[in-house]
């Protein structure tokens, strides 16, 4: 007798937080086979650390894992040395073997903060590509045309703008697609920016005599600026290995407009519980309360319960990055009095972190002022309602909430 939930119930759980399933009919058919499906998601180790944007996809892997399916966390050590052209306006420089191996090791440590290591297969696509010959690669390349590759949005833009496209970049979607053949994947997961690559795998499987995989895309998580996708290079990220206090404060610093989005994509709470919290906020509950609830959940997930309980605290008179000292004052500042935009020197003064305006300006000019642990210069300003942790020097700190 099968231990799987009915296919329709599984589908409903899988649909949560997804952008698109290609196709739901095919997925339902596979689920009705009452067998562990082979679920694949690939990650190119192009940077040493994962952030919460990556975990949206990993959370979906966990959902499949909890339903009893076979999850493969594929580390694209081979494809990382090609460089994924997705969303790029120029050719990405390839990484060295040493960089890839170091990053891959860190990825494994971080992903098991979410996935069960005893139920997760970790594979490297160099396992099969290092065995391929030039003839194999040419045969793979023959499966697609240049015109099909140019249907990809980023390639089209570069072609129309007379920007170079290297031949090896055309190979990337084919190589990623072949990963699905090597793993005989039933389902592949990816971000919405990976749709072209996922569909390539679906197409290639059919041409290589396999049943085509289902492609599931998940949304791209916006960063703390509320505009751009979460990215370490943009400084708008929350790292999986951030210290508890830093993670807690970063969640509190997100714009109110992201609260629903972050709960939907990052929280493991039930949809009913999340909706209840959102209803309370709509009826007047302080948005900061919801941010604290989510912050505590995330700190506990990536650290532990004790870290979550003490995330808002710190020790000693000297401030340690990532630790918010106990008793940190909370200050509210109205932007309306400043025409909607207020610069950092004024913020430091109004928060009581210096005795006067001259000291505030001096602290900023010396690089002694940090916002959410990041040093800022005199051009930093606040134009929206958010909460920041403002630090001036080694001892002065305040949690500042901005209102209209």
Curated annotation (Swiss-Prot):
InterPro entries: aa-tRNA-synth_I_CS, aa-tRNA-synth_Ic, Rossmann-like_a/b/a_fold, S4_RNA-bd_sf, Tyr-tRNA-ligase, Tyr-tRNA-ligase_bac-type, Tyr-tRNA-ligase_bac_2. Residues 342-402 form the S4 RNA-binding domain. A motif ('KMSKS' region) lies at residues 229-233. Disulfide bonds: none annotated. GO terms for biological process: tyrosyl-tRNA aminoacylation. It comes from the Bacteria. It catalyses: tRNA(Tyr) + L-tyrosine + ATP = L-tyrosyl-tRNA(Tyr) + AMP + diphosphate + H(+). It is found in: Cytoplasm. Its EC number is 6.1.1.1. ATP binds at residue 232. A motif ('HIGH' region) lies at residues 45-54. Belongs to the class-I aminoacyl-tRNA synthetase family. TyrS type 2 subfamily. Homodimer. PANTHER family: TYROSINE--TRNA LIGASE (PTHR11766:SF1), TYROSYL-TRNA SYNTHETASE (PTHR11766). Catalyzes the attachment of tyrosine to tRNA(Tyr) in a two-step reaction: tyrosine is first activated by ATP to form Tyr-AMP and then transferred to the acceptor end of tRNA(Tyr). This is Tyrosine--tRNA ligase.
């Amino acid at each position: 007798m099968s231990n799987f939930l009915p296919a329709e119930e599984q589908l409903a759980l899988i649909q949560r937080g997804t952008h698109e399933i290609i196709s739901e009919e095919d997925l339902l058919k596979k689920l009705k086979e009452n067998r562990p499906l082979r679920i694949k998601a690939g990650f190119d180790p192009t940077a040493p650390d994962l952030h919460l944007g990556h975990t949206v996809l990993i959370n979906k892997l966990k959902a499949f894992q909890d339903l009893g399916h076979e999850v493969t966390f594929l580390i694209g050590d081979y494809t990382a040395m090609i460089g994924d052209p997705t969303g790029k306006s120029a050719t990405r420089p390839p990484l060295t073997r040493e960089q890839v191996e170091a990053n891959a090791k860190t990825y494994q440590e971080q992903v098991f903060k979410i996935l069960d290591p005893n139920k997760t297969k970790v594979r490297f696509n160099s396992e099969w590509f290092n065995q391929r010959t030039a003839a194999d690669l040419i045969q793979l390349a023959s499966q697609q045309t240049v015109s099909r590759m140019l249907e990809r949005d980023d390639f089209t833009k570069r072609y129309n703008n007379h920007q170079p496209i290297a031949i090896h970049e055309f190979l990337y979607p084919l190589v990623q697609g072949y990963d699905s053949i090597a793993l005989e994947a039933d389902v592949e997961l990816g971000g919405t920016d990976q749709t072209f690559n996922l569909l390539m795998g679906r197409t290639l499987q059919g041409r290589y005599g396999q049943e085509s995989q289902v492609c599931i895309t998940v949304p791209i998580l916006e960063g703390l600026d509320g505009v751009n996708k979460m990215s370490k290079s943009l400084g708008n990220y929350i790292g999986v290995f951030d210290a508890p206090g830093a993670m807690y404060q970063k969640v509190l610093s997100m714009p109110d407009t992201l609260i629903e989005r972050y709960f939907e994509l990052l929280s493991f709470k039930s949809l009913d519980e999340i909706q209840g919290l959102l209803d309370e906020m709509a009826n007047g509950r302080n948005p900061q309360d919801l941010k604290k609830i989510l912050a505590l959940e995330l700190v506990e997930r990536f650290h532990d319960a004790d870290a979550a309980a003490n995330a808002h605290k710190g020790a000693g008179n000297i401030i340690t990055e990532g630790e918010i000292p106990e008793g940190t004052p909370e200050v509210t500042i109205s932007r309306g009095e400043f025409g909607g935009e207020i610069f950092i020197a004024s913020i430091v003064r109004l928060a009581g972190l210096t005795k006067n305006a001259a000291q505030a300006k001096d602290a900023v000019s010396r690089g002694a002022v940090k916002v959410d642990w990041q040093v800022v210069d005199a051009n930093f300003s606040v134009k929206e309602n958010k909460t920041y942790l403002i630090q001036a020097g080694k001892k002065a700190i305040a949690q500042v909430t901005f209102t209209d």
